[in-house]
Regions:
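Extended beta-strand/beta-hairpin segments
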Residues: 1-41, 52-121
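Alpha-helical metal-binding/catalytic segments enriched in His/Glu/Asp
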Residues: 46-47
Length: 121
C-alpha cells in the first residue's frame, strides 16, 4: 500500500507528507514541480528501475548508468532510453517487453494514454 497526505496552503501550492522528504508542488512549471511533472518523473523513474532490473537479472549488472528522457504532451508520453555504449543489447524487443510487463506506473494509465518508449541511437 502507498499513502500520502497533501497539505495546501494557498492557490496552486501544496506539500506532500509521505515517504522521505516532503515534495513541494506548484500549479505552473515555472514555479517548480507540478502534479503532471511528478507523473512524468514517476514514469521515467519506473522505466529506469525496470531497465536496471532487466540488466541485473539477465546480464548480472548490479550498477548501471542509465538516462531516460521523458516528455508529456496531450495524452502522449515519449521516453528515450540512453544506455552506456559498452552495454550489449541482445534483443531490443525483449528489453522493451520487460519494461512493459513490469513498469507498474505505466500500467496505471488509461488505454488511450500513449506511452512511446525507445532506445536512443
Amino acid at each position: 500500500m502507498y499513502q500520502t497526505t497533501i497539505k495546501g496552503d494557498k492557490p496552486y501550492h501544496s506539500f506532500s507528507e509521505g515517504y522521505g522528504a516532503p515534495v513541494e508542488l506548484f500549479g505552473y512549471t515555472e514555479d517548480g514541480e507540478t502534479p503532471m511533472s511528478l507523473v512524468n518523473i514517476a514514469l521515467a523513474s519506473c522505466v529506469t528501475m525496470c531497465l536496471q532490473s532487466y540488466f541485473a537479472k539477465f546480464q548480472g549488472k548490479e550498477e548501471l548508468a542509465i538516462r531516460v528522457d521523458s516528455s508529456y504532451e496531450e495524452g502522449h508520453f515519449k521516453l528515450k532510453i540512453h544506455l552506456h555504449e559498452n552495454l550489449v543489447i541482445e534483443n531490443e524487443d525483449k528489453l522493451l517487453a520487460f519494461v512493459d510487463e513490469f513498469c507498474r506506473v505505466k500500467k496505471l494509465f488509461r488505454e488511450d494514454i500513449v506511452v512511446d518508449i525507445s532506445l536512443a541511437p
